[in-house]
Design a protein with these regions (language model features):
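Active-site-adjacent structural elements in enzyme catalytic cores
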Residues: 6-7, 12-185
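Short, low-complexity, charge-dense intrinsically disordered segments
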Residues: 1-5
Length: 185
């Protein structure tokens, strides 16, 4: 993937930055930097309790397009929106069934994804053109801190080229997406 050198107007190959973060001593500066990349529409791969996710600003149509491009994924394949706080669910959904709170309190944070009617805040690029949005709240502390630093809503399919095995390490992500995304944490 190419990026523009704003100073000289020259296109150059993107270099993916890797920031090693110890889950027992989280580098808040690295989290803030990754969050800023996401807020500005860039892509950051990050760990969850299952696999590495390819994070983007879930409320940014252009960020969704970048996700599909980096993965080589069809744009009608919806992305899952990750949240860090249950209260954030009401901003991106409508007509939430009462059973949701019971499920969320039992299974979130954790690897449960629930599907809801989307609010107007969520672009169709994120939902693959659907009127519904898939939402989950990961239990991984690094993931949750990143989601908060990014503004609360991060779309994140697995951080791999479509059709390849889901990555379980930063090295797997690097081998597959180096040069296509801004950062791996």
């Amino acid at each position: 993937m190419l990026s523009a050198d704003k100073k000289n107007g020259i296109m150059k190959a993107m270099e993916t930055i890797i920031k090693k973060i110890d889950k027992y001593q989280i580098d808040e500066d690295a989290i803030r930097e990754a969050g800023e990349i996401l807020r500005e529409g860039g892509l950051v791969a990050f760990p969850t309790e299952t696999v590495y996710g390819l994070g983007a600003n879930a409320l940014d149509e252009e960020a969704a397009k970048k996700t599909y491009e980096a993965k080589g994924r069809p744009s009608d394949n919806p992305l899952i929106v990750h949240i860090a706080d249950l209260e954030d669910l009401s901003e991106i959904t409508e007509n939430v069934p009462p059973e949701t709170e019971l499920l969320a309190k039992h299974f979130w944070p954790g690897p449960l994804t629930m599907i809801f009617e989307k609010s107007s805040l969520v672009p169709y690029g994120t939902t693959g053109g659907l009127d519904t949005v898939a939402v989950r709240m990961p239990s991984d502390l690094i993931a949750r801190k990143l989601i908060l630093a990014a503004g609360g809503y991060v779309s994140a399919p697995s951080a791999n080229t479509s059709g390849r095995p889901s990555p379980t390490t930063a090295e797997h992500v690097w081998e597959d997406l180096n040069g296509k995304i801004e950062m791996i944490i």
